[in-house]
Swiss-Prot record:
CDD domains: Ribosomal_L29_HIP. It comes from the Bacteria. InterPro entries: Ribosomal_uL29 (IPR001854), Ribosomal_uL29_CS (IPR018254), Ribosomal_uL29_sf (IPR036049). This is Large ribosomal subunit protein uL29. GO terms for cellular component: ribonucleoprotein complex; ribosome. GO terms for biological process: translation. Keywords: Ribonucleoprotein, Ribosomal protein. The keyword Ribonucleoprotein applies. Signal peptide: none annotated.
Length: 63
């Protein structure tokens, strides 16, 4: 998810997407631990998506 897409989401949508992304990251890490992923770069992209969402959520809560 790109930063421009993240900025357009509401706070409730951000929280929902953050939960989904964290779950996806957890699932990918578990799958990678059991057997190597075909594309391990997925871990990095999902982790960065989680960071983008969390950063935007924190920024909005402070305003």
């Amino acid at each position: 998810m790109k930063q421009s897409e993240v900025k357009e989401l509401s706070v409730a949508e951000l929280q929902e997407e953050l939960g989904k992304s964290r779950k996806a990251y957890s699932d990918l890490k578990m799958a990678h631990a059991v057997s190597p992923l075909e594309n391990p770069i997925q871990l990095r992209t999902v982790r960065r998506d989680v960071a983008r969402l969390a950063t935007e959520l924190t920024k909005r809560e402070q305003q």
